Amino acid sequence: MSRPDSAVSLLPDYSLRAHNTFGFDARARVAARIGSPGQFASLARDPRVAGLDRLVLGGGSNVVFTRDFDGLVLLDEIRGRALVREDDGAWYVEAGGGENWHAFVEWTLAEGMPGLENLALIPGTVGAAPIQNIGAYGLEMKEHFASLRAVDLATGELVEFDAARCAFGYRDSFFKRDGRGRFAIVAVTFRLPKAWTPRIGYADVARELAARGIDARAARARDVFDAVVAIRRAKLPDPLALGNAGSFFKNPVIDAQAFAALRAREPDIVSYPQPDGRVKLAAGWLIDRCGWKGRALGAAAVHERQALVLVNLGGASGADVLALAHAIRRDVLGRFGVELEMEPVCL
């Protein structure tokens, strides 16, 4: 699951431009490439970096740098993926924290272990997936999560986390709250049930399957994977061509009474009933209705095809993107009385 431990080389005054999908040219006071859990642990006791704040970076797809990072950036490059066990009901697969998420999903399908196909093409690494509890098209990562191992960056101890300890929420977990900045996730194990049925509740997925001449009831996991990839490529910009961090805002969830009042004013509002009686709203619809889709503030803009995505047109800073985000939040709150929450971590 990783290369053997070796001495960790430190990289002073390190550019993070290639390590965040917005392409911001922030710099780290010092950085280190990490290829094993032992290397994470060794830096907990390394006098060269004693007292420095620490930041673990995988793909950098969920971070907005508003300034240089005056500390130690740990670049997670722990690789490896394997079937670690199976029983009558499921396969258990493990992947290193530095593995590319999309490549991992594609590998599980190639190995005949479906279940994660709705999460195809989400940017980032396997280690970042539990932090955000990534989700898309009717599936959240937590539904197939078994356990993870993480290094305590203060002590160097290797710690095991089950789902309860991770405290997953909507695009949220222990690692975004009490555990923020304290742990480096080095490996994640997923449980993929052998009794598989397609998740095709989202209209976009059903439409894409139909356009491909596929009966949704007979869809294979690879069909769903291909449909999701096509949808995401049509709607979302490639970060290599146009800097972005994917969905910038969470879809807000409000109580039924507030929704009834809102729908009386906005009868065509896009919404999704939740099991607990609350209602999830489509943040992109709210932003679009406020007239922000396709608009720019300087070199930061709202994408023309997906209002949830903020983009760097070239030369924007993290502060520029945050200024745009705050303007959008202000307008949505003023018109709908709904407060949008940002998904990325802002530093």
Curated annotation (Swiss-Prot):
Its cofactor is FAD. One of its GO terms (biological process) is regulation of cell shape. It is found in: Cytoplasm. Pathway: Cell wall biogenesis; peptidoglycan biosynthesis. The keyword Transmembrane helix does not apply. The active site is at 171, 247 (proton donor), 343. Its EC number is 1.3.1.98. Keywords: Cell cycle, Cell division, Cell shape, Cell wall biogenesis/degradation, Cytoplasm, FAD, Flavoprotein, NADP, Oxidoreductase, Peptidoglycan synthesis. Residues 24-195 form the FAD-binding PCMH-type domain. Coiled coil: none annotated. GO terms for molecular function: FAD binding; UDP-N-acetylmuramate dehydrogenase activity. GO terms for cellular component: cytosol. It catalyses: UDP-N-acetyl-alpha-D-muramate + NADP(+) = UDP-N-acetyl-3-O-(1-carboxyvinyl)-alpha-D-glucosamine + NADPH + H(+). Cell wall formation. Belongs to the MurB family. NCBIfam families: murB (TIGR00179), PRK00046.1 (NF000755). This is UDP-N-acetylenolpyruvoylglucosamine reductase. It comes from Burkholderia mallei (strain ATCC 23344).
